[in-house]
């Protein structure tokens, strides 16, 4: 999300039909039913899989890259957690799993030298991981607000990042 001070901020929502990630170098990775695009300059790619039905689409994922391993490892675990779950039970399971994922990912972020984004587990699990949280954390770290983001028109969303989960999908931003 920003190159300032060499810090990489990553946020993406990977679902059954769409998922996006931005990483250091301003290159986009596309997940879900899309292929991975231009994964050659990955510094770190950290995220979580929201879709428990499809999991990680190995046959559609495109070229592998070592930095993708931490994302890939969550899919089977998350998918198993959803077996037999419907309605509110499934939602609760989703939140529980996302909280566990968040803790593992926070540790991975720190190992990569990336600070915590300061989002509580409840907010993470509820899909409220939004741009305002990211920008607030950047400001606390003394990093200027990125200037290359804007809300895109609907036809441009194929080149966008979704910051947030299924409950925050309207917060879509595009790299200029």
Give the location of each predicted region.
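Phosphate- and other anionic-substrate recognition elements at nucleic-acid/protein interfaces
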Residues: 1-176
């Amino acid at each position: 999300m920003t190159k300032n001070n060499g810090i990489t901020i990553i946020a993406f929502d990977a679902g059954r039909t769409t998922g996006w990630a931005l990483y250091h170098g301003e290159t986009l990775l596309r997940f879900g039913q899309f292929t991975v695009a231009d994964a050659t300059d990955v510094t770190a790619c950290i995220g979580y899989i929201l879709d428990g039905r499809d999991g990680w689409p190995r046959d559609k994922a495109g070229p592998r890259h070592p930095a993708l391993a931490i994302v890939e490892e969550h899919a089977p675990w998350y998918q198993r957690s959803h077996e037999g779950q419907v309605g509110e039970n499934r939602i609760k399971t989703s939140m529980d799993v996302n909280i566990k994922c968040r803790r593992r990912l926070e540790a991975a972020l720190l190992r990569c030298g990336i600070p915590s984004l300061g989002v509580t587990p409840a907010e993470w699990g509820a899909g409220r991981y939004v741009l305002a949280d990211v920008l607030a954390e950047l400001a606390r770290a003394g990093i200027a607000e990125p200037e290359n983001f804007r809300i895109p028109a609907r036809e441009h969303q194929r080149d966008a990042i979704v910051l947030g989960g299924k409950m925050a999908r309207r917060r879509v931003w595009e790299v200029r």
